[in-house]
A protein has these predicted regions:
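N-terminal strand-loop element at the rim of the active site
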Residues: 2, 9-15, 28-66, 152-160
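A short, charged, and often flexible helix/loop element on the N-terminal side
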Residues: 53-79, 122-128
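Membrane-proximal helix-turn-helix segments that form the acceptor-binding/catalytic region
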Residues: 79-82, 104, 128-146
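An aromatic- and histidine-rich active-site surface loop
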Residues: 69-82, 86-115
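Donor nucleotide-sugar binding/catalytic pocket of nucleotide-sugar-dependent glycosyltransferases
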Residues: 109-112, 137-175
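A short, histidine- and acid-enriched strand-loop-helix "catalytic/donor-clamping" loop
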Residues: 66-68, 97, 111-128, 142-145, ...
């Protein structure tokens, strides 16, 4: 049985946004019997913690999945997931700044959905944008596979980094 961990999301049951809905679809909709999922969730977002949801194991990290703590949240989740996974699906790039170090001690298969072009969003200041661009670059460089959720992101990855991204458009119900 293949063991797949999913990190970078607030968690499931979905109560936040798009990545959480995607995870709901991955673990629940036509989920192959030969894949066992573990989803890493923010303990701060789930006061009532389930250990299993839709046949996926849930593991809780005592940090916020959003804001400045998201970087550490993603790194801690990645380290914990390494022990129990064959493949790690990383949703978003904030913790990918750690991948150069991670690759020194692990060759686990990493599939990364880079999401949007976070470094271009107006809500971020200049230092946050630079950090997000660096993390995105590390995500693409160290990923075994990059996922784009739309053609624009797929084209961007090809033009910016010379790497092909797999296109899996949202809703995720066809994953």
């Amino acid at each position: 049985m293949k063991r797949v961990s999913i990190i970078g999301t607030v968690g499931v049951p979905a109560n936040y946004g798009g990545f959480e809905s995607l995870v709901e679809n991955i673990i629940g909709y036509n989920s192959p019997a030969d894949i066992h999922y573990t989803v890493y969730c923010s303990a701060k977002s789930y006061p009532h913690r389930q250990s299993v949801y839709k046949n996926a194991d849930l593991k809780y990290v005592p940090l916020d999945a959003n804001g400045s703590q998201s970087i550490l949240y993603d790194i801690v989740s990645l380290i914990k997931a390494t022990k129990k996974s064959d493949v790690i699906l990383i949703l978003g790039v904030s913790g990918c700044c750690f991948l150069p170090i991670y690759r020194l001690f692990s060759k686990k298969r990493l599939v990364i959905n880079i999401d949007g072009l976070e470094h271009r969003r107006e809500k971020w200041g200049k230092y946050a944008k630079a950090f997000l661009k660096f993390s995105e670059k590390m995500a693409v460089k160290y990923a075994d596979a990059v996922i784009a959720d739309n053609k624009g992101i797929q084209d961007y990855v090809r033009e910016e980094y010379g790497k092909e991204a797999e296109l899996i458009a949202y809703g995720g119900d066809h994953v």
